[in-house]
UniProtKB/Swiss-Prot annotation:
It catalyses: D-ribose(out) + ATP + H2O = D-ribose(in) + ADP + phosphate + H(+). This is Ribose import ATP-binding protein RbsA 1. Signal peptide: none annotated. It comes from Escherichia coli O157:H7. The lineage of its organism: Bacteria, Pseudomonadati, Pseudomonadota, Gammaproteobacteria, Enterobacterales. Keywords: ATP-binding, Cell inner membrane, Cell membrane, Membrane, Nucleotide-binding, Repeat, Sugar transport, Translocase, Transport. NCBIfam families: PRK10762.1.
């Protein structure tokens, strides 16, 4: 089968790092090509070379059989290559039609916008995707899943023959994910080629035909998905066998450190639980169950309306995140780009941001040597891959950004570490490193709350698990009691079993 798109022998270097070396990618009509690799493997760089954001240093790009060079996103888009980014590029205050045709509106012979034609054409695009809503609806009124469908419709408006989807299900519910897969099947039947970038093995084996593996900027293999197992694919990605995906540390927790009684706040209703020294407490539940809200109320990022919290026997009142930090409670957000990191600042500045008091003299000036030493120690301990501590953190891979976010929390010397979706958007190799770090914190006596939507992660890493349902605690289970079935029953409200200490 002749490829719609071929990239061969692609090289791309930046100061101090070779991002791509001999990388290759083929996209075939009517097939979905998964592009996988650890964070930092070169997937994003390859997409930027393909769409003309970066100029390649070497290699060839064949588009519909002809050697081509795209001068920028506009030229690749007009040629028929569409990309749907992880962060959606839509304007909430405009309608669907206005978003789809932004900058290329239909005009009548008087030079005015032809709204009737524009909405009719947008409705046709939505109908192609079997969507039930009309294009006069505001994008801000749509769910994230439906907004993603608008992005696909926008790509189709350019008559795109190849569509690139970057982590498309990251913020979707299970129902929205199934809708996306239905649309992908529809696009395949129209002969379009799809590049599907994802860390989620289940999705790759469900919806992709072929897979291309990158490792350290190099092309490793192209295979039919049907010829692989999850283990063999992971082995190609990381270059080694992952013997134990969730390396649980069997060490008995100590005395009760944190006690939460009848906590209430926005989205949180009468929640009570305990957390021991050197314990990993898993928090499970469906999207919207109130897990993140509970953590934010506990930390001080959301207001507490009632309830009582003690830490090491002393009452803790957190009216702001500063109160949480001052009391030894650290929260690492699920949305590191919005709440966790300052992307324009360096690795060093991000890591030491909340711990500057430890590096300050009485007059307020910084002890730069102490700060640099501490940051250097954490970079080494956490195996953060960065050319230097002065590198802008926005240029690091997702896994390395997450390590910096966790390191920043630990710099404040906390007693309780709350990790909200710590491995979201992180590849399998970096996940394993984060799990090993969590075990190290546990061994050092740190109390850890692990909030995760990945049930195997919660089951694999936790000593004890609590489950949230509609703002309430619907279950509490020991490691031995917990199974996927039991946790899911509690998550949907079919089971209510809470054993308070």
């Amino acid at each position: 089968m002749e490829a719609l798109l071929q990239l061969k022998g692609i090289d791309k270097a930046f100061p101090g790092v070779k991002a791509l070396s001999g990388a290759a990618l083929n996209v075939y009509p009517g097939r979905v090509m998964a592009l996988v690799g650890e964070n930092g493997a070169g997937k994003s760089t390859m997409m930027k070379v393909l769409t003309g954001i970066y100029t390649r240093d070497a290699g060839t790009l064949l588009w519909l059989g002809k050697e081509t060079t795209f001068t920028g996103p506009k030229s690749s888009q007009e040629a028929g290559i569409g990309i749907i980014h992880q962060e959606l590029n839509l304007i909430p205050q405009l309608t669907i039609a206005e978003n789809i045709f932004l900058g290329r509106e239909f005009v009548n012979r008087f030079g005015k916008i032809d709204w009737k034609t524009m909405y009719a054409e947008a409705d046709k695009l939505l109908a192609k995707l079997n969507l039930r809503f009309k294009s006069d609806k505001l994008v801000g009124d749509l769910s994230i899943g439906d907004q993603q469908m608008v992005e696909i419709a926008k790509v189709l408006s350019f008559e795109s023959k190849v569509i690139i989807m970057d982590e498309p299900t990251d913020a979707l519910t299970d129902t929205e994910t199934e809708s996306l897969f239905r649309v992908i099947r529809e696009l395949k039947s129209q002969g379009r080629g799809i590049v599907y970038i994802s860390h989620r093995m289940k999705e790759i084996f469900e919806s992709c035909d072929d897979v291309t593996v990158f490792r350290d900027g190099q092309f490793i293999a192209e295979r039919e998905v049907a010829s692989l197992t999850e283990d063999s694919l992971i082995e190609m990605m990381v270059g080694r066998k992952l013997e134990d995906q969730y390396p649980h540390l069997d060490k008995a927790p100590g005395d009760i450190r944190l006690k939460v009684d009848n906590l209430c706040g926005p989205g949180v209703n009468d929640v009570s639980f305990t957390l021991r020294k050197g314990e990993i407490l898993g928090v499970s539940g469906l999207m919207g169950a109130g897990r993140t809200e509970l953590m934010k109320v506990l930390y001080g990022a959301l207001p507490r309306t009632s309830g009582y919290v003690t830490l090491d026997g002393h009452e803790v009142v957190t009216r702001s995140p500063q109160d949480g930090l001052a009391n030894g409670i650290v929260y690492i957000s699920e949305d590191r780009k919005r709440d966790g990191l300052v992307l324009g600042m360096s690795v060093k500045e991000n890591m030491s941001l909340t711990a500057l008091r430890y590096f300050s003299r009485a007059g307020g000036s910084l002890k730069h040597a102490d700060e640099q030493q501490a940051v250097s120690d954490f970079i080494r301990l956490f195996n953060v891959k960065t050319p230097s501590m002065e590198q802008a953190i926005g240029l690091l891979s997702g896994g390395n950004q997450q390590k910096v976010a966790i390191a920043r929390g630990l710099m404040t010397r906390p007693k309780v570490l709350i990790l909200d979706e710590p491995t979201r958007g992180v590849d399998v190799g970096a996940k394993k490193e984060i799990y090993q770090l969590i075990n190290q914190f546990k061994a050092d006596g740190l109390s850890i709350i692990l909030v995760s939507s990945e049930m195997p992660e919660v089951l694999g890493m936790s000593d004890r698990i609590i489950v949230m349902h509609e703002g309430h605690l619907s279950g509490e289970f020991t490691r031995e009691q917990a199974t996927q079935e039991v946790l899911m029953a509690a998550a949907v409200g079919k089971l209510n079993r809470v054993n308070q200490e």
